[in-house]
């Protein structure tokens, strides 16, 4: 068990993990947080699904503008937490150029990870059944389908279909967060 003296104190930072639905954002975010804890850092994980639930928001029929407004709420929450020295790992879609630009200018020690998974692969995985429900006309306003997603043009790390070495990828992200 670690003692208080083993806890690392860092300046606040934000690791923003983004990609389309089903890309693996939550999984990667959880792995990064676990690895940070192993390093003696006490991070916070903000997951888009959990945040929407906590805020009582359903995005199933959200317009692009409403999703953008919610993404700014997430970004501002990250800024608030990081300004108090918190290491924030956020796993959320928020695929808007406006958000990417704002984050780069306003979030301290910002590190952006883009999970660049082809739509064909996401439809095959369809872990939440979203793409199937979309094809049946049950849901609308799905990023990458109904409306175009703005993929990050300056992500610090881009991950393709399969992570060759998941441990190495998590380690790379953690090193960046720790400033190594």
PLM features: residue spans?
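Conserved lysine of the Walker
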Residues: 25
């Amino acid at each position: 068990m670690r003692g208080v003296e083993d806890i690392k104190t860092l300046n606040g930072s934000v690791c923003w993990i983004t990609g389309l639905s089903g890309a693996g954002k939550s999984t990667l975010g959880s792995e990064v947080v676990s690895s940070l804890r192993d390093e003696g850092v006490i991070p916070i994980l903000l997951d888009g699904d959990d945040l929407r639930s906590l805020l009582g928001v359903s995005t199933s029929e959200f317009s692009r503008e409403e999703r953008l407004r919610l993404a700014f709420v997430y970004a501002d929450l990250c800024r608030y937490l990081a300004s108090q020295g918190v290491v924030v790992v956020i796993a959320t879609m928020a695929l808007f150029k406006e958000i990417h630009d704002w984050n780069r200018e306003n979030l301290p020690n910002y590190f952006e990870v883009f999970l660049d998974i082809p739509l064909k692969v996401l439809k095959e995985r369809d872990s939440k059944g979203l793409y199937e429900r979309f094809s049946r006309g049950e849901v609308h306003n799905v990023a990458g389908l109904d409306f175009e997603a703005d993929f990050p043009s300056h992500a610090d790390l881009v991950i393709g279909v399969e992570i060759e070495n998941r441990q190495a990828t998590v380690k790379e992200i953690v090193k960046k967060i720790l400033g190594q």
